[in-house]
Amino acid sequence: MSTQKLWGGRFTETGAKYVDDFGASISFDQLLAAEDIAGSLAHVKMLKKTGILPAADVDQIVAGLETLAERQKQGELEFSTVNEDIHMNIESLLTEEIGPVAGKLHTARSRNDQVATDFHLYLKHQLPLILDRLHELETVLVDKASENVETVMPGYTHLQHAQPISYAHYLLAYYQMFKRDMERFEFNLKHTDISPLGAAALAGTTFPIDREYSAKLLGFSEVYHNSLDAVSDRDFVLEFLSNASILMMHLSRFCEEIVSWSSYEFKYISLSDQFSTGSSIMPQKKNPDMAELIRGKSGRVYGNLMGLLTVMKGIPLAYNKDLQEDKEGAFDTVTTVLTSLHVFTGMLATLTVNEDRMADATTNDFSNATELADYLANKGIPFREAHAIVGKLVLDGLKKQRPLQDIPLKEYQSISPLIQEDVYHDLNAKVAVERRHSLGGTGFDQIRQELQRAQTQLSAYQSETTD
């Protein structure tokens, strides 16, 4: 491989090796090798179509690039920091493959639009993989919710028992979060599906190129309509990192509850041994390490977002070398998101729900206090007065260790003769859940309707991606 830099004509001195190493990005942007070759193939075919390059030259370049593409698939390409980045490494390898005619490939193109094209292609390929993983997670959520429609558990506010809910209702809350994540990534894909190829360095080119043609060859839906914007834009990457951060936040919240609920104090759920680890010193331990790791990995994704935001905030138009720092965080985030989703989905699919423990937790926790207040309000007592009455009953019950459903009817009627035997029906946790049939509520009928809606949405995605 040549040690002569492809841009070296203007220079009389060579840089020191440590300077070359500092400026080189090939250690990480080699991940874009397939996209770089694909972009070059589309570009040179466009040069042939427009008559900018002779057909014979183009055919030779195409053959060389196709050879490199095959070698890349086999992992046979060797790169050098002397050639800095993936673009110049590929061109150098092409020169070795076909000779000086390879130098014509860069006609009407700059590394500025080249790297932007590579990055667009990379995320364009990765986003559907993330969407598929999210769809798999949503499917498991819906399946698990379908199995637990009538599994009653405490609902929490401030991590205090608040009102009884269905475990399925809890799971479907996360389904809605992940559904919004999917919608954000789908919108992100639209912003990624735009070709910057042909913008050249920043001002376009004097050659009669056909940008729409090269965009079509690469599968892009449209092209950038401002060459400065085309080479300067990293909004699509920031949007991806932002969406990924929100997704990881959702996973982290879920993992926090998995960690807590699998503890001895809660015992609401039990994790499969496949997704747990032990202790090197304490034989009894079964640690929720995978949930903790996913929770922890949210921080590195946040860091990747803040890193690129900080890089971008001070960059004038158009390209600046700072933009070399846009890739490692994005690459890391793609890997982190894909692996986190894969592990989390398996963990959720295999966890066991302790229905009896969840139900027991609603028995003596006074989470039916709102039911009693509503009962009194329905009997004509103003809600604020009912709220105060029930608050005093709860305080008394805490002192006597007596839940609301154990208060004798005679004692209730001393508060109001309107209270009848049916009050005990309303104080039952399962009944309390079932009666919350307002739209979006935790009532069993509402949950079944939401499950049906979710299954329709999942089927629609499946149909769209298989057509």
UniProtKB/Swiss-Prot annotation:
KW Cytoplasm (keyword) present: yes
GO molecular function annotation: argininosuccinate lyase activity
CDD domains named among the record's database cross-references: Argininosuccinate_lyase (cd01359)
Transmembrane segments: none
Pfam families (UniProt xref): ASL_C2 (PF14698), Lyase_1 (PF00206)
An example Gene Ontology biological process: L-arginine biosynthetic process
SUPFAM superfamilies cross-referenced by the UniProt entry: L-aspartase-like
EC number: 4.3.2.1
Source organism, top-level taxon: Bacteria
InterPro entries: Arg_succ_lyase_C, Argininosuccinate_lyase, Fumarase/histidase_N, Fumarate_lyase_CS, Fumarate_lyase_fam, Fumarate_lyase_N, L-Aspartase-like
Any one annotated GO CC term: cytosol
Places the protein is found: Cytoplasm
Keywords: Amino-acid biosynthesis, Arginine biosynthesis, Cytoplasm, Lyase
Pathway assigned in UniProt: Amino-acid biosynthesis; L-arginine biosynthesis; L-arginine from L-ornithine and carbamoyl phosphate: step 3/3
Catalytic activity: 2-(N(omega)-L-arginino)succinate = fumarate + L-arginine
Family assignment from sequence similarity: Belongs to the lyase 1 family. Argininosuccinate lyase subfamily.
Protein name: Argininosuccinate lyase
